[in-house]
Structure formats: C-alpha cells, structure tokens
C-alpha cells in the first residue's frame, strides 16, 4: 500500500508543511532526524546530497553544512534555532526560513510527525519559489522517514 503524508493548509502563504503518523516512539524518530548525516537519506526534494559537515547529534545552537544541488551544486550553512528533545527540531539556513520538525507521541505508541518550512520571517523574494515546491517535498520526506523508521528494528 502506498503511503502518503497529509499536506497541511496553514492559512499563511509562507508557512507550508505536511504531517504523517509513524509507528514508532518519538525518541526513535527524533534520534534519526537529530543526526543531520541522515537528512540526505530522507530528503524529498532530492536537493540534499549528503557529505554533511557537522555534529552527529544536533542541539540548540549547532551549526551544520549540507551539500546541496538545485541546478548547480552549493553548500548550505544551517543553525539549530529550536530544540526540545524528542519533540521539536528547527534550523535556519542563510535564507532565514526555518525548517522545523514537530513530534507528538500518541497513546498507541506511534508518533505524529509534522514538518514545516516557515518563511514568514525570511525575505519574501527568496521564498516565492520555495513555497511552490516545499509542501510536496516535505510530504515526500515524511514518507521516506516513515519507510526507514518502520523498517528499522
């Protein structure tokens, strides 16, 4: 059966996201996404190219660099600006938008995972193109995350 993430309507032009439920505890999912070396494995935009420079586990204030490609290759510097263990992880690249994961542990042991691209405080000229594709890329990322997490013992 094909998995799909729900694309969310935030009601705000520069805030796009998606949500999925993963059959795993929040701590397991958070451990995976808090390691930026895993981001290329789940990236739904196909822009993250791995070979990341940075820590094995992110925390508030962590800086990490991702090799990216959108037409031409480039390196994106990021800084963690939001962090609550097993609940929230958000980072900002140079464009000043925030990429954010929110995890909510459910009573049945599964976890609701929401990812946002929040460009409300970023220069709008940089966000105009981003909002045209980010929600679909986020939905694909969440489906990839679910597949990997649920396959791991």
Identify the residue ranges that each predicted region occupies.
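Short loop segments at secondary-structure junctions
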Residues: 23-26, 83-86, 106-108
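Hydrophobic ligand-binding cavity/cleft-lining segments
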Residues: 1-54
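Secondary-structure transition/hinge residues
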Residues: 37, 41, 121, 146-153
């Amino acid at each position: 059966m094909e998995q799909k993430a729900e694309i969310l309507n935030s009601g705000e032009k520069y805030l796009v996201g998606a949500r999925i439920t993963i059959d795993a505890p929040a701590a397991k999912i958070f451990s995976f996404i808090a390691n930026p070396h895993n981001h290329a494995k789940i990236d739904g935009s196909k822009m993250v190219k791995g070979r990341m420079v940075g820590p094995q586990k992110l925390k508030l204030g962590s800086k990490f660099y991702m090799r990216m490609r959108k037409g031409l290759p480039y390196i994106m510097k990021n800084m963690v600006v939001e962090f609550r263990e097993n609940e929230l992880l958000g980072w900002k690249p140079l464009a000043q938008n925030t990429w954010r994961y929110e995890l909510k542990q459910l009573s049945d042991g599964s976890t609701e995972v929401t990812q946002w691209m929040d460009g409300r405080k970023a220069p709008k000229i940089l966000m105009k193109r981003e909002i045209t594709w980010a929600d679909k890329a986020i939905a694909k990322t969440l489906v990839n995350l679910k597949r990997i997490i649920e396959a791991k013992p």
